[in-house]
Amino acid sequence: MSTLPPGTAPIKPQYLLSTKPQAIPDDDAAEGTTSIVKSAGRGEDDSGNGQPSRRALAKAQKKARQGANKGRRFGKVRDEVELCWKVANGAICDFGTSCRFTHDIAEYIKEKPQDLRIPLLSEFKESPPYGPDLTVIGKPGKKHPNIDFSTKCPVHEESGECRYGYKCRYMGGHALEDEEGNVTLVADEDKKAQVALTSHEINFVGGDVQKQLRSKKYPTPIASAYLEELKSMNDEAQKPQAVVSETTVMETDEAQPSSTDAVASEATQNGTEPAPAEEVISKRVGGVQSGKDEPDVPMRFSEKRRLDWKGKTYLAPLTTVGNLPFRRMCVKLGADITCGEMGLATSFLAGSKEEWSLVRRHPSEKIFGIQVAGNKPHTLVPTAEVIAKEFPTGVDFVDLNCGCPIDLVFKAGSGSALLDNAGKLGKIIQGMNRALGEIPLTVKIRTGVKEGRNNAHKLMPRISAEWSASAITLHGRTRQQRYTKLADWDYIKECVAAVRAREADEDLPPVPIFGGGDCFSSQDYWEKINNYGVDGVMIGRGALIKPWIFTEIKERREWDISATERLQLIRDYVEYGLNHFGSDTAGVNTTRRYLCEALSFQYRYVPIGLLERLPAKINERAPAFVGRSDLETLLASPDSQDWVKISEMFLGPAPQSWVFTPKHKSNAYGSEEGQG
């Protein structure tokens, strides 16, 4: 047995390069960065001259290498000569000669970069140079040496046609060259008909809808009616009202507008009972005036689609890395439930093209949800109504994010900030529920905001029984905690018990409850299911580091996956990425960017064949090590330049102008530091 510091992954001595554990990247810090945030000056002394002290300088240098790269920007890489999209697909351009893109197909093909190809797994080996030279054309055209007629286009192979036409970097896979050198595009009509419903992404929002949203002309009558009710209720709450007791009559003026159910709840928490009328309103209509035409709380079970999630695996919604190609790969590996990346309600209502792209769904995603974040009913309820109207059959549930810890979201009153505002949260959930119709609403929360001040055990029974959420997921950490601290599964168990007790008291069917935090193996997963009362475990970081965890869970085993098998998963991701982001030059390099993002997590995986003890723990830090082959060592490299090299094994050489900036600064330094 090796002697390693506590909290260090127990790697067998023969694979160790150093006994010093490498720093775990701060996932919270990286998640909290945006392209508009600027780095603040660190370590300045108190003299006011802006000069750092020696001690502060040393601390700042250390922190600078451990923090997040703020303001990351990824420019779009385009062809030097840009062909008109309409002409590229054999159509007629509406702009004619005034089009700002070229219509000269022959000239474009002449200047176009050479075709790419995705090597087969059998072409790779586990020692350098690992794979074939992708700069070599397999079957060049007679008059077009830059076209490879032996390549296969992943888009054409899947759907029978390629929507990128002449712009496709794998054009030789769906083109023919005649004796005179003319190149024509071809399609597989039989395959197009066969896969029309199984390969095409769904949940597209058209330009007309985006325009309506931008101009604030999109009709949301359900949301408008609900918000008007809230306004009337708040106006009524601000009026002086007579409160009758057994001994006296007195005039009171409410200090702040709040929903009736929130007032009733606060009274109960203070040890007093709410007035009978308030109690009835609170339980049955959740703070909306009783005179309105409002469905009862039990509507969740009689009219909402029921969520049968027992025994199903759930891939957590993940910002940036939880894109459609990654979700598709996880589905192939065994994930049953998937959810899109978090979208902001304000951006949805502004008609943001980028935000609405987050709701796309691949047909292989069996149970799919859209996650929304916001800070008030006035944005979240209309967003829910738009989603319900645009995708009545394209979404299985909508998830309200009440767990996001990042500063940008929290300080705006969204995400985990809602955990400390039960009155507002109740209004949001009830309003979204009404706007969504039969589409279920789920809620993702944390144990609380501040460490030592958990409140999920109070909120969850209300979220389920009182506010009618159809499922709850609970991450076992507060907003204040960092990933270096373990999730509190004992508290998760306490929260589940509180919900089940409330449901039993009110004779309500149980809603699915999923816990989350630190699940990194099949053994972890089933231990949580068997001992903590949850219906399932939402898996986030565990899936980012080892997407095959879903296979392990389904097969109840720990998979000592080989480097070659991991390479196959990378190849799958590349094909899925090209289908989603595009097979033209821009799409190839967008796929490259997100592949590198995925590898920024997957390099952290320590092959279980190298460990002295199983199962591996997600928070154990790995010392520098070598794998069982050069390829396995490469896949474990913390150097972001090595991730780019891996991308080049499938996507060809990266353009000189293309640079990948990792989220974590420590990954931007040479791997020699990590090996020291």
Swiss-Prot record:
Swiss-Prot/TrEMBL keywords: Cytoplasm, Flavoprotein, FMN, Metal-binding, mRNA processing, NAD, NADP, Nucleus, Oxidoreductase, Repeat, tRNA processing, Zinc, Zinc-finger
GO cellular component terms listed in the entry, alphabetical order: cytoplasm; nucleus
Region annotated Disordered, chain positions: 1-72, 253-298
Major subcellular site: cytoplasm
GO molecular function: flavin adenine dinucleotide binding; mRNA dihydrouridine synthase activity; RNA binding; tRNA-dihydrouridine47 synthase activity; zinc ion binding
Family designation: Belongs to the Dus family. Dus3 subfamily.
Protein name, as recorded: tRNA-dihydrouridine(47) synthase [NAD(P)(+)]
